[in-house]
């Protein structure tokens, strides 16, 4: 299903709630709403009164510092994972893509990049302006380069948030909420299947779109990824992982629209999707 339409809506829950449950749900919703509003206020204040009002070169430095600050906040538990997603999407939306392409040396990376023999996206670690290595502990800075038809196979993460900002070209993005972990499968619910271009950010966390799958649509597409690890360290998962958990979301969906996606190895994911 394309054109931005959601593949499936969340199922309706039963209407028999106790007043205590309803109160807890309302408090949780209000707390989350206040948290997002507070972070939007902080970001907008920074955009209006700090480096965002200065020449763009200073803007990229402040953008880098804000990325590091957001990573520190979510790792420390002072910012909820879903709030981090909205905050980094808001932050990226303030930047000029052409300037980021220059400051992140995208053209130089494209000249030197070594593509895998399989149709997988190539990955290059990069630096950020105005940041020393000590400033970037706990989060990554990566360029993903996709040839037409190459991909990052579908996978889930534990204890991680990340955001891919498209800098060049077109990328097909398929995302899924992670509903339940089984012994050798993950129950997922499709949320997005669409093609996006420069300026669009795709983020993920445990709470929203934990499973993603990217495929290059144009001859060359480039995304800038900011993964932040060791998030919510006390959380337990039904399926542990040291890194990516590769799955096959192409199996038929259940009657409720959800998919019981088998967990597969990385070589199996490469054979099937690349």
Per-segment meaning from a language model:
Residues 118-148:
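A short glycine-rich, His/Asp/Glu-containing loop-to-beta-strand
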